Amino acid sequence: MVIKAQSPAGFAEEYIIESIWNSRFPPGSILPAERELSELIGVTRTTLREVLQRLARDGWLTIQHGKPTKVNNFWETSGLSILETLARLDHDSVPQLIDNLLSVRTNISSIFIRRAIRTYPDKAREVLETANEVEDQAEAYTRLDYSIFRGLAFASGNPIYGLILNGLKGLYTRVGRHYFSNPEARRLAQGFYQQLLNILHTKQYELIVDSVRDYGRRSGEIWHGMQVSMPTELLPAR
């Protein structure tokens, strides 16, 4: 087990999460007692207690007063906040994880983008027009792409879509820095934003879903072509 965290709390969190992932503390099992675990990891009980509370909030553990701390099946109890952690723990699974992320983005965005453009065109226009001033480099496009999808999610009038995008931000932006290093990806994205603006201006709302799905398909093709050059440390440890 190689742990790169620098603070005692970060080290303890990494240790416990990796132990759960590697089945040293398998789902359904009971964690060692606080004193034993703090000595095993090499941190104070106060630090360990804070870490355990944080991991419980993220769905890794169940803590009940007077009962031993139980390890959860995190797939069933955790939220989107653990995506970065999962990608870091198992680099081999990153391509599939990102494929799933792109698929989810396409499926939900075809709904909220259509709703935003049809129902709240002024808000949608304001979001999309930010694409007109973006600098042609990876970091700028990463921020822009996330901002546009998130902005349209909130502009749809259903804030739940925006909250989903909030939960995806960490992995979304880290992947984006690699993806948008490809000029073809930046050109495709800019064309997509302008296409949505044109649909908004012409009120050809029936074209929205196909436009979003086509962008999802073509961006997926670019991404698949870039996987061979994906950084080994796509997601650094905390």
Curated annotation (Swiss-Prot):
DNA-binding region in chain numbering: 34-53
Gene Ontology biological-process entries: fatty acid metabolic process; regulation of fatty acid metabolic process
Gene3D superfamilies: GntR ligand-binding domain-like, Winged helix-like DNA-binding domain superfamily/Winged helix DNA-binding domain
UniProt keywords, alphabetically: Activator, Cytoplasm, DNA-binding, Fatty acid metabolism, Lipid metabolism, Repressor, Transcription, Transcription regulation
Subcellular location: Cytoplasm
UniProt KW Cytoplasm keyword: yes
Pfam families, per the entry: FadR_C, GntR
Record's function text: Multifunctional regulator of fatty acid metabolism.
Protein name as annotated: Fatty acid metabolism regulator protein
Source species of the chain: Erwinia tasmaniensis (strain DSM 17950 / CFBP 7177 / CIP 109463 / NCPPB 4357 / Et1/99)
Gene: fadR
